[in-house]
A protein has these predicted regions:
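Mixed-charge, Lys/Arg-rich low-complexity intrinsically disordered regions
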Residues: 1-17
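Short acidic DE-rich linear segments
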Residues: 2-4, 57-60
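Short, charged beta-turn/beta-strand-edge "cap" motif at the junction between a beta-strand
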Residues: 10, 28-31
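Context-gated lysine
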Residues: 17, 28, 59-60
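Basic/aromatic-rich interaction segments and small domains that mediate binding to polyanionic partners
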Residues: 33-58
Length: 60
């Protein structure tokens, strides 16, 4: 299980792939269904959409 939060290194965030089991250490845990990476000019935003319907968002 991969822990995703603000302290997660960028290389770990980039290595997450569909089907990986992830958690935000609070209430969101599940398999990754889709990954979106966007850049707002200041931060790179990683959005991990889980099969449970929840989304874990990390700004780095």
């Amino acid at each position: 299980m991969i822990r995703l939060n603000q302290d997660t290194p960028i290389d770990v965030l980039q290595d997450v792939k569909n089907g990986d089991l992830v958690t935000d250490t609070f209430s969101k845990t599940g398999l990754v269904e889709e990954i979106n990476i966007s850049d707002d000019g200041l931060y790179r935003i990683y959005e991990f959409h889980l099969v449970t319907g929840r989304t874990i968002s990390i700004k780095k």
